[in-house]
Regions:
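Non-ligating segments of multi-cofactor redox enzymes
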Residues: 1-514
C-alpha cells in the first residue's frame, strides 16, 4: 500500500446560480495576458449544451482519456507511443481556435473620440488575435448561457445518449442546469501520458497536476489527450498552460480563487488519502458503470488506526492526516455518497466531484404533490432534470448512484422541513435512504449553513519534504528570457521593454562637497 494525499474539490450543483464570478476572478488572476485571451481555466456551462470548447465530451472526435484494450491494459485513446509520435507535427484531432472562440474586445475609446454626428457612436467588436474589426461574433465561452441558441445544436450534447432527446426540445419538457468546470487534477491523468516531452507531472504532496514551462515544447498532444479539454496553448509563449489549482494559495492553507470568491458557496476543498498502488486496477475496470465504485475503493479511511499508522510511516505529515479526518470532500463523497465524479468513463479518475442538482417538478399536473409510489419520499423520476442525463454526466450511465444522492438530499429536506415548519421530528424519510439523525444534521450543516472553516480544510504544505529548496535560492520566477538575469530581449510579460535601474547614490547636487 502506497499512501498519498490529494487536495480534492466538491461542487454542489444544487446551489450554483450561474453568476460566473469564479470564471471572472480566475481569468483576472491567471489568464488575462497576451496569448491566453481565449483560455478560461474555470468556466461555467449551461447544460444541456455542447460546451466549451465545442463538443468537448465527444471523445470519438477529440480522442481524449483512456481506452481499455482486450488484454485489460490501458492505452491513451489518442494512441500508443509510436502513434502519438507519428503525428507529432500534424495532430489531426487538435481543437482549433474556432472550436473555442475568437477572443474580442470593443472599441470603447471610439465612444470618447468620435466626432459629433447625427447618430450615436457604437463600440464595435475587435479581434484580440488579429486586431481587426469583427463583422459578427459567432461563438463564445458562454454562448449557450440560459439555453441560448437553437435546440438542434444543444441536442448534440453527448449526455443525451440512451434518451429520447427530441422530447426535451419541447417547451414543457425543457430543463437546464449549471456546470462549473476546471481541471480535474486526475489520479490517472491522460495528459501526462500523452506529453512527448514529459513536461506534465503530478505533485506527490497534494496531487496537483502542473506543466513544467521549461520542459514544455509546445507539441500540444496534451490538449488532445485531456478529455476535459482544460489545457490551453499559449500562442505567444509557445507553451501549454492549465489550471494550477492555485497551488501557491493551497500551500499556505488558503482556498483556490474560484472557491474563495464563489457567491453561492458551492465549493468545498479538503484532503483525501488514497492508495496509489490501486490506481491502475481501478482505472482498468472492465465495465464503465463500475468505475465510480472502483475509484471509491482507492480512497482510504483517514480515521482507521491502521491507515494512520501506515501513513505516518510513509512520511505523510500529521497535519495532513488531521485535515483528511475533517475533510468535507471525504464526507460528501465517501461518508454520505452525495458527490460523484465527472465522466468517470474517461478512466482518468477525476478529483473534482459534483453533487447532482435537485430540480423542480416536471409538470403542473404534479404541483399538488409528487407521486410517491407508496413511500414517504416522492418519485425522483418526476423531477424535471432526467435522471439518465445526470447519470450520463456523473456516473457513466449508471442511475443508481445518482438516485441515491438525490433521494438522500430529498430526505434531508423532508426531515428539516417537518422539524422547522411542522414542529415534529419525522425520521421515516431518512430511515428509508439509510441515514441516521446525526448524519442528516451534519449534512444540513455542510450543505446549507457551513462556515468558511467547514468548507475549506486545507493543511499548510511541507515544501521542505517535497523538494530541495537550496538550488532555487536564486530563482528568477516565471519569465520568457527577460527579467532578473538581464537578457537583451525586448519581450516583457507586461508588453514593455525591461528598464534597468539606474544607480543614483553617487550623484551629487550642484555645490555639494565643494
Amino acid at each position: 500500500m502506497k499512501i498519498r494525499s490529494q487536495v480534492g474539490m466538491v461542487l454542489n450543483l444544487d446551489k450554483c446560480i450561474g453568476c460566473h464570478t469564479c470564471s471572472v476572478t480566475c481569468k483576472n488572476v491567471w489568464s488575462s495576458r497576451e496569448g491566453m485571451e481565449y483560455a478560461w481555466f474555470n468556466n461555467v456551462e449551461t447544460k444541456p449544451g455542447i460546451g466549451y470548447p465545442k463538443n468537448w465530451e465527444d471523445q470519438d472526435q477529440w480522442q481524449g482519456g483512456w481506452i481499455r484494450g482486450i488484454s485489460g491494459k490501458l492505452t491513451p485513446r489518442l494512441g500508443n507511443r509510436v502513434s502519438v509520435l507519428s503525428k507529432i507535427f500534424a495532430n489531426p484531432v487538435l481543437p482549433a481556435i474556432d472550436d473555442y472562440y475568437e477572443p474580442f474586445t470593443y472599441d470603447y475609446q471610439y465612444l470618447h473620440n468620435a466626432p459629433e454626428g447625427k447618430y450615436l457612436p457604437t463600440a464595435r467588436p475587435r479581434s484580440l488575435i488579429s486586431g481587426e474589426r469583427m463583422d459578427k461574433i459567432n461563438w463564445g465561452p458562454n454562448w449557450e448561457e440560459l439555453l441560448g441558441g437553437e435546440f438542434e445544436k444543444r441536442a448534440r450534447d453527448r449526455n443525451f445518449e440512451a434518451m429520447q432527446k427530441e422530447m426535451y426540445g419541447q417547451f414543457e419538457n425543457t430543463f437546464m442546469m449549471y456546470l462549473p468546470r476546471l481541471c480535474e487534477h486526475c489520479l490517472n491523468p491522460s495528459c501526462v501520458a500523452t506529453c512527448p516531452s514529459g513536461a506534465i507531472y503530478k505533485r506527490e504532496e497534494d496531487g496537483i497536476v502542473l506543466i513544467d514551462q521549461d520542459k514544455c515544447r509546445g507539441w500540444r498532444m496534451c490538449i488532445s489527450g485531456c478529455p476535459y479539454k482544460k489545457i490551453y496553448f499559449n500562442w505567444k509563449s509557445g507553451k501549454s498552460e492549465k489550471c494550477i489549482f492555485c497551488y501557491p494559495r493551497i500551500e499556505s492553507g488558503q482556498p483556490t480563487v474560484c472557491s474563495e470568491t464563489c457567491v453561492g458557496r458551492i465549493r468545498y476543498l479538503g484532503v483525501l488519502l488514497y492508495d496509489a498502488d490501486r490506481i491502475e486496477e481501478a482505472a482498468s475496470t472492465e465495465h464503465e458503470t463500475d468505475l465510480y465504485e472502483r475509484q471509491c475503493e482507492v480512497f482510504l479511511n483517514p480515521n482507521d488506526p491502521a491507515v494512520i499508522e501506515e501513513a505516518l510511516k510513509q512520511g505523510i505529515p500529521h497535519n495532513v492526516i488531521e485535515a483528511a479526518q475533517k475533510s468535507p470532500v471525504y464526507k460528501l463523497a465517501m461518508d454520505w455518497k452525495l458527490a460523484l465524479p465527472l465522466h468517470p468513463e474517461y478512466r482518468t479518475l477525476p478529483m473534482v466531484w459534483y453533487v447532482p442538482p435537485l430540480s423542480p417538478i416536471q409538470s403542473v399536473a404534479d404541483a399538488g404533490g409528487l407521486p410517491s409510489n407508496g413511500n414517504i419520499l416522492p418519485a425522483v423520476e418526476s423531477l424535471r432534470i432526467p435522471v439518465q442525463y445526470l447519470a450520463n454526466l456523473l456516473s457513466a450511465g449508471d442511475t443508481g448512484p445518482v438516485l441515491r444522492a438525490l433521494k438522500r438530499m430529498m430526505a434531508m429536506r423532508h426531515y428539516k422541513r417537518s422539524q422547522t415548519v411542522e414542529g415534529v421530528t419525522d425520521t421515516r424519510a431518512i430511515e428509508e435512504v439509510g441515514l441516521s439523525v446525526e448524519q442528516v444534521e451534519e449534512m444540513y450543516r455542510y450543505l446549507a449553513i457551513a462556515n468558511y472553516e467547514d468548507r475549506f480544510v486545507i493543511p499548510t504544505s511541507h515544501r521542505e519534504l517535497a523538494e530541495d529548496a537550496f538550488p532555487e535560492r536564486n530563482g528568477c520566477g516565471f519569465t520568457f528570457g527577460d527579467g532578473c538575469h538581464g537578457s537583451d530581449t525586448k519581450f516583457n510579460l507586461f508588453n514593455s521593454r525591461r528598464i534597468d535601474a539606474i544607480d543614483v547614490s553617487g550623484v551629487r547636487k550642484h555645490g555639494e562637497g565643494e
